A protein has these predicted regions:
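Basic/polar N-terminal segments that are highly enriched at the extreme N-terminus
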Residues: 1-2, 21-30
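Acidic/His- and Gly-rich active-site-bordering loop/insert found
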Residues: 26-136, 143, 152-163, 170
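Residue-level micro-sites within transmembrane alpha helices that shape
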Residues: 6, 137-139
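Bacterial N-terminal signal peptides
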Residues: 9-20
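Bacterial N-terminal signal peptides that target proteins for export
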Residues: 1-10
């Protein structure tokens, strides 16, 4: 079981490191289309302070986890003063007898004005194999990688040796 946990963490970290250079997932691969859909949807939500879109993004991601087979009681959207947090538990079999691991990311971005950008900051644009838009790297890419990774592992029937907890803040 240690090997599968190590493999999961290694692959997740590898994806995050490689994706910081260029996000060019083959959308024809299994889960590639779903990952791209989540990425595009999240970049195109203006989750800046005062825009009240973080709760919308949290609810969208919660619905993806529900569709992906995560029990409703393990998915929590916590709305607080115009923003939100999302907490998702991936239940393990406790074969490792260890405490849960928390994986965190943030759903919000610093606001951007259209006139300050060459492109609309809240429209995902691909040019020459690179994606442009507010949050494409920090941190909607990481959030998408974790989300898509959990969805894929769940679909493949993988059960972690301990609980894994997603904690996305707004």
């Amino acid at each position: 079981m240690f090997n599968s946990m190590f493999k999961f963490l290694f692959v997740t970290l590898l994806l995050l490191v490689l994706s910081s250079y260029s996000f060019s997932a083959d959308i024809n691969m299994p889960f590639g289309q779903k990952a791209f859909e989540i990425y595009k949807t999240s970049v195109e939500m203006r989750t800046a302070e005062g825009q009240h879109q973080v709760p919308t993004l949290a609810r969208y991601l919660a619905s993806e986890f529900k569709k992906g087979g995560f029990p409703e009681e393990d998915i929590h959207v916590l709305e607080i003063e115009g923003t939100a947090a999302l907490v998702v538990r991936y239940r393990g079999d406790d074969s490792l007898g260890k405490k849960p691991i928390s994986i965190s990311a943030h759903m919000d971005v610093v606001d951007a004005l259209r006139e300050d950008w060459e492109r609309d900051p809240f429209t995902l644009v691909e040019e020459n194999g690179y994606y442009f838009g507010r949050g494409t790297v920090d941190n909607k890419l990481g959030m998408t990688a974790v989300t898509a990774g959990f969805l894929r592992l769940k679909a493949e029937g993988w059960v972690p040796g301990r609980d894994l907890i997603i904690a996305f803040s707004g």
